[in-house]
Amino acid sequence: MRTAIVYYSLSGNTAYVAEKIAERIKTLGEVDIIRIEPKKAYPDKGAKKFFWGGKSAVMGETPALQPYEFNIEKYDRIIFGTPVWASTFVPPLRTFINENPDVKDKKIAVFTCYSGGGADKATDKMKKHLGIEKFEAELILIDPKDKEKEENDAKIEAFCSALI
């Protein structure tokens, strides 16, 4: 089975988890990691980070993305990785989904990273945006780069086991 892990990461938490998941599921088949980035970067520090990221998320914006390589035909499964901004998934992933509407026809899993809550709402909004009822697997982590390594590793392992 060929899997694409498609994610956006501002502070590094989502990137950290994407690498951990890729490491664990590579025994299932080929895994490609696709980091998406908006053409205009979001501020990554201070009040501007929360204001511009939150505004963009709440308004449902779809920012233009940096070029990325993705061919839906190559993949059986898509794993989305997103920080939670204002109780929703990040705008760059909204753009990616809009640009690749056939992803909904693949097996889909999701992982979220957050500091302030709203992860369940974020995954529900992503399901609605994709037009699907459920994910193959879901993983929610609080600040995974900085929190208890063993606890997060166990959650990542359970998520990956659900994909088998």
Where are these regions (language model features)?
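N-terminal beta1-alpha1-beta2 submodule of the flavodoxin-like/Rossmannoid cofactor-binding fold
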Residues: 1-78, 87-89, 94, 99, ...
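Short beta-alpha junction loops
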Residues: 112-117
